């Protein structure tokens, strides 16, 4: 008398019930707080949307970093009374001339305190400062990683768009937003660095002379759409990194503005600046463009304020979004753009459905024709494997792409291949004259190692595709991995259990394989 392993029965029932619950949201719109409600997340090629490839302008970032370093050096040289001249930033390095060779040693001491990864090249009194290759690589990785997070916050501020963001190469970012029908909006919010800076206005400067090129030392010229030119102090009072909130609102004249609040440190500094500069103007500059320059009528100790500038409601909301997400460390350039319409995505889904149904039907017909009732058991196991795949895709919110559908269809054949291998082993045992029970037991045991080896090698390939691939290749790898795991479970556990139940309760004289 054959005993059915209770753990197999229990495991199969639990897995199947769990799979039905997880896959249910794909077939009904009814939501329940007690059940999962996530359906399969469709990729760009199935749902339609926007595809952008962004280039991180690291050269601009590096030049700005060098400019800041140059300002720091000027201050340090003055404090240490180091004589120099012609300190300039050229081609992402700093060049200067020292007063004498004796100044080189204190210069190196200052550089080592600022950043030991800065290389110092001396040719007589001429000095060239540049970052080491290791520091450049570290900075590039940091800038790209920061840019990815800020892009994510800008594109998905509400947490509902589920953008796909991946690093490509050293300085490229792949952005895919399924369901986004307006790529122009994406380009608008990604094309702005959103670097907000507060400057005191240089009240003594002559704007007309500054426009002609005679800008006072320590000041700079900025321009705005509404206010024209204005000379401001080059030193920033506060930056957008001190903001905690930013939101679109309306002033007393019902004009759209952006209200903001500083963090505790920013509030304290803002209060001190406004207290010490009552009656002067404070310029608000965004990406080197003058937004406004209100007069400081009284100290602002609350750490909040508004930005005006002829905003529409849409532009005020956009600016508030950019400020909340934070400024990009470097400008982004769009080097590739594609837009996939929802109709094309619907066509892809329909094509995928047809391919899946035809493939499934062909496999089922082949198995029944070749192995009779045992082929039917394999088809039942295959159906459950597809249910498990759908459930796992929904549970883990894996993105299903068109190549992913191809991966699932591929696993159909692999699942049946495992059953074919098992049945052929059983057939070999039956041809030797062994009993049905022994043939089934030996067939599954002898085929298991081969099935495991073949699936493990495929899993290794899928893992490598996921690690080194991007976009649709990752989707294929994920679907293939889930399909392999599900098909192995169904072929080894479900099929064996169905055959054992049939043999125990119906006691067939022949298995129909000889």
Swiss-Prot record:
It holds the Pfam family SecD_1st. It comes from Rickettsia bellii (strain RML369-C). Disulfide bonds: none annotated. The chain crosses the membrane at residues 7-27, 357-377, 389-409, 448-470, 482-502. Forms a complex with SecF. Part of the essential Sec protein translocation apparatus which comprises SecA, SecYEG and auxiliary proteins SecDF-YajC and YidC. It is found in: Cell inner membrane. Its main location: membrane. It comes from the Bacteria. It is a multi-pass membrane protein. Keywords: Cell inner membrane, Cell membrane, Membrane, Protein transport, Translocation, Transmembrane, Transmembrane helix, Transport. HAMAP family: SecD_B. One of its GO terms (molecular function) is protein-transporting ATPase activity. Belongs to the SecD/SecF family. SecD subfamily. GO terms for biological process: intracellular protein transmembrane transport; protein targeting; protein transport by the Sec complex. This is Protein translocase subunit SecD. GO terms for cellular component: plasma membrane. Part of the Sec protein translocase complex. Interacts with the SecYEG preprotein conducting channel. SecDF uses the proton motive force (PMF) to complete protein translocation after the ATP-dependent function of SecA.
